[in-house]
Structures are given as structure tokens and as C-alpha cells.
């Protein structure tokens, strides 16, 4: 097992917690201070890259996952695909809808032009909460023919059950709260 202690220390030390945001009763983990600290960002990217060193493509989830995914792809020498929220890409696109607490959302990637068929993909995002977004991302890249070899996040909120929802995929979270 890889030692992620430097990344865990940086995340624990630098994360800013905001109570009652974006709504009452929610405690929001703002990882912006982790990303803005050069050493913090470096050790987090290094730890995420260690999760799947042989991956061919990073699937970076809109929007904070873009910051991490680009760094991880650069570290590994792999490609990166931006998994976008609906309506941000020109057609044709592949899409995957998923359920939110109050409605649905859709994620998209370009159809056909990014060559995912048969390639190994690591899905990267900042936070795992309920797992809806990450599950939809994994299903989306699989629909393009990719093999999801793992999911890696900086912070996991265990009480929200996302790990169980993602049970079929190898999952690494640097910090669990």
C-alpha cells in the first residue's frame, strides 16, 4: 500500500470547512487552500498519481477535478479527458444522467473523437460524497469503451455512503471524514 501521509497531512492542515454551506445543515469542505499551496497541491497530485501508475487516461470531473486531473495526467504522462456538465460541449457527445437530491444532472464527453475504446482510465475528483457523480462518470467512460481501473479522490465523506455505491471500482481516498 502506498504511503499517502504527506498528502493526508496537507489536506488535514489546509482544508477550510464552511458550516451551513451551500445550505443549512451541510458542512462544506473547501479544498481551494490545498490547491493554492504549492507543496500541498504537489503532494496531493503525487498521491493520486500513485493510485494507478499504469493508467492511460485520467477522467477529470467538472470542475475541481479538472485541477487535479491535469496534474495527475502530467505526473503520469497520460492523457486527460474533461468530464463536463451538460451543455458545455458541442455535439456529438456521449452523456450519462444521474439522480441528485432534487432532480437529475447529466455529464458529457465528446463522442468518438477522444479514442477511449479499450484504454485504462482513472477517474479523479476532489470529494466523494454520495457517489452519484463518480458513478455516472465511471459509467460514462465505460460507455465509450474504456476500462475504469480505479477512482481516486482527495476527501471522502464516509457518512454519505459513496464508497458503497462505487463498490465495483477500486477506490482510493486520501482523507476520510
Swiss-Prot record:
Keywords: Cytoplasm, Glycosyltransferase, Purine salvage, Transferase
Keyword Transferase among record annotations: yes
Record carries keyword Cytoplasm: yes
Major localization class: cytoplasm
Cellular location(s): Cytoplasm
Pathway noted in the entry: Purine metabolism; AMP biosynthesis via salvage pathway; AMP from adenine: step 1/1
PROSITE patterns: PUR_PYR_PR_TRANSFER
Top-rank EC class of the record's enzyme: transferase
Catalytic reaction(s) noted: AMP + diphosphate = 5-phospho-alpha-D-ribose 1-diphosphate + adenine
GO CC terms: cytoplasm
One GO term of the biological process aspect: purine ribonucleoside salvage
Superkingdom field: Bacteria
Molecular function per GO: adenine binding; adenine phosphoribosyltransferase activity; AMP binding
One Pfam entry name: Pribosyltran
Protein EC: 2.4.2.7
InterPro entries in UniProt: Ade_phspho_trans (IPR005764), PRibTrfase_dom (IPR000836), PRTase-like (IPR029057), UPRTase/APRTase (IPR050054)
Main function: Catalyzes a salvage reaction resulting in the formation of AMP, that is energically less costly than de novo synthesis.
Family per record: Belongs to the purine/pyrimidine phosphoribosyltransferase family.
Description of how the protein assembles with itself and partners: Homodimer.
Protein name per UniProt: Adenine phosphoribosyltransferase
Biological source species: Rhodococcus opacus (strain B4)
Lineage, broadest ranks: Bacteria, Bacillati, Actinomycetota, Actinomycetes, Mycobacteriales
Amino acid at each position: 500500500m502506498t504511503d499517502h501521509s504527506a498528502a493526508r497531512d496537507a489536506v488535514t492542515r489546509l482544508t477550510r470547512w464552511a458550516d451551513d454551506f451551500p445550505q443549512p445543515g451541510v458542512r462544506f469542505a473547501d479544498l481551494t487552500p490545498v490547491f493554492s499551496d504549492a507543496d500541498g497541491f504537489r503532494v496531493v497530485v503525487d498521491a493520486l498519481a500513485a493510485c494507478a501508475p499504469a493508467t492511460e487516461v485520467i477522467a477529470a470531473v467538472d470542475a475541481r477535478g479538472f485541477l487535479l486531473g491535469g496534474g495527475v495526467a502530467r505526473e503520469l504522462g497520460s492523457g486527460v479527458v474533461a468530464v463536463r456538465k451538460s451543455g458545455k460541449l458541442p455535439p456529438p457527445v456521449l452523456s450519462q444522467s444521474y439522480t441528485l437530491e432534487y432532480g437529475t444532472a447529466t455529464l458529457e464527453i465528446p463522442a468518438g473523437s477522444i479514442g477511449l475504446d479499450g484504454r485504462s482510465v482513472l477517474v479523479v475528483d476532489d470529494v466523494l460524497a454520495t457517489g452519484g457523480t463518480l458513478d455516472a462518470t465511471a459509467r460514462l467512460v465505460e460507455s465509450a469503451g474504456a476500462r475504469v481501473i480505479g477512482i481516486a479522490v482527495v476527501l471522502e465523506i464516509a457518512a454519505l455512503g459513496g464508497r458503497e455505491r462505487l463498490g465495483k471500482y477500486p477506490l482510493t481516498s486520501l482523507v476520510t471524514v
